[in-house]
């Protein structure tokens, strides 16, 4: 069984945390301040996850391109 990279483990752990946050928010049992803190953490996790997915997509596009000499370069997301 191949080892997972640190990034994929981090992505999976972040996704699990995000799912837990969503469940807690949907329960409606949190105080307002706690709900806001959870929401803020969820937004941070979602943005980080989007960045990881964009980087993975770029790597796949490069690997599937016709240019056999294409090099992988670090992905720099556009700032909003």
Curated annotation (Swiss-Prot):
HAMAP family reported for this sequence: Exonuc_7_S
InterPro entries on file: Exonuc_VII_S, Exonuc_VII_ssu_sf
Location (main, coarse): cytoplasm
Molecular-function GO terms, alphabetical: exodeoxyribonuclease VII activity
Function: Bidirectionally degrades single-stranded DNA into large acid-insoluble oligonucleotides, which are then degraded further into small acid-soluble oligonucleotides.
Name assigned to this protein: Exodeoxyribonuclease 7 small subunit
Keywords noted in UniProt: Cytoplasm, Exonuclease, Hydrolase, Nuclease
Family matches, as Gene3D superfamilies: Exonuclease VII, small subunit
GO process terms (BP): DNA catabolic process
